[in-house]
UniProtKB/Swiss-Prot annotation:
Belongs to the connexin family. Beta-type (group I) subfamily. This is Gap junction beta-1 protein. One of its GO terms (cellular component) is cytoplasm. Disulfide bonds: none annotated. Keywords: Cell junction, Cell membrane, Gap junction, Membrane, Phosphoprotein, Transmembrane, Transmembrane helix. One gap junction consists of a cluster of closely packed pairs of transmembrane channels, the connexons, through which materials of low MW diffuse from one cell to a neighboring cell. It is found in: Cell membrane; Cell junction, Gap junction. It comes from Bos taurus.
Length: 284
């Protein structure tokens, strides 16, 4: 299985993740995918051909193997890693959409040169607003997928130790036959390692959800105690808000009113018509 494409996609998300999220990604790729690709696939590579039962009855080996190993450990872990990594793509799509809006605003303001557009693509997006919800939802889904696969693994293979010998009496076996599993010790070691890595990822996901909620509450408390000034506020999200647009309209009206009063001061003999218009504008 080629994991390069998945790694490329998730590396982009890593730039906008929290510190705990970056640790989670390291655990995913170093302790799980690398071990799965380099070692585990070779250990389980001959599991079907080396599963031998002490009978010559045609079909008995295949039926017994399917009974005790309904899905290969390697394929189950591969499916788990793909589904666990998929929610992170929600964050990547949200960040791409947000950067697209920022580029659009730059073009509307006359700053659509390649240098500014590249700067938008490179800068780190803060986890706030709707992106905060997207990020939290993705972490929760990661947590649910990890827990669901741990439960499925427990249902399929109770215990973590790989047995050396199994007894099978499924049809078409003529009687109860003994079947031998290849490399049971190696498979037990890798099973324990992968389950431990999955448990670490669950702990990291829980810690990241708690961290995100705590940081959002702290930010909200800080905003209530120190409301942000309008002068220092920037960013494209603020420029798109209705409050910003209304403030700009009021500013233009006040500037127009001030310039009209200036004209009246400089030429006092222009008549009462302009004064009336000025008063009318002020009343508006």
């Amino acid at each position: 299985m080629n994991w390069t494409g998945l790694y490329t996609l998730l590396s982009g998300v890593n730039r906008h993740s929290t510190a705990i999220g970056r640790v989670w990604l390291s655990v995913i790729f170093i302790f799980r995918i690398m071990v799965l690709v380099v070692a585990a696939e070779s250990v389980w590579g001959d599991e079907k051909s080396s599963f031998i039962c002490n009978t010559l009855q045609p079909g008995c080996n295949s039926v017994c193997y399917d009974h005790f190993f309904p899905i290969s450990h390697v394929r189950l872990w591969s499916l788990q890693l793909i589904l666990v990594s998929t929610p992170a793509l929600l964050v990547a799509m949200h960040v791409a959409h947000q950067q697209h809006i920022e580029k659009k605003m730059l073009r509307l303001e006359g700053h659509g040169d390649p240098l500014h557009l590249e700067e938008v693509k490179r800068h780190k997006v803060h986890i706030s607003g709707t992106l905060w919800w997207t990020y939290v939802i993705s972490v929760v889904f990661r947590l649910l997928f990890e827990a669901a696969f741990m439960y499925v693994f427990y249902l399929l293979y109770p215990g973590y130790a790989m047995v050396r010998l199994v007894k099978c009496d499924a049809y078409p076996c003529p009687n109860t036959v003994d079947c031998f599993v290849s490399r049971p010790t190696e498979k037990t070691i890798f099973t324990v390692f992968m389950l431990a890595a999955s448990g670490i990822c669950i702990i990291l996901n829980v810690a990241e959800v708690v961290y995100l909620i705590f940081r959002a509450c702290a930010r909200r408390a800080q905003r209530r105690s120190n409301p942000p000034s309008r002068k220092g506020s920037g960013g494209f999200g603020h420029r798109l808000s209705p409050e910003y647009k209304q403030n700009e309209i009021n500013k233009l009206l006040s500037e127009q009113d001030g310039s009209l009063k200036d004209i009246l001061r400089r030429s006092p003999g222009t008549g009462a018509g302009l004064a009336e218009k000025s008063d009318r504008c002020s009343a508006c």
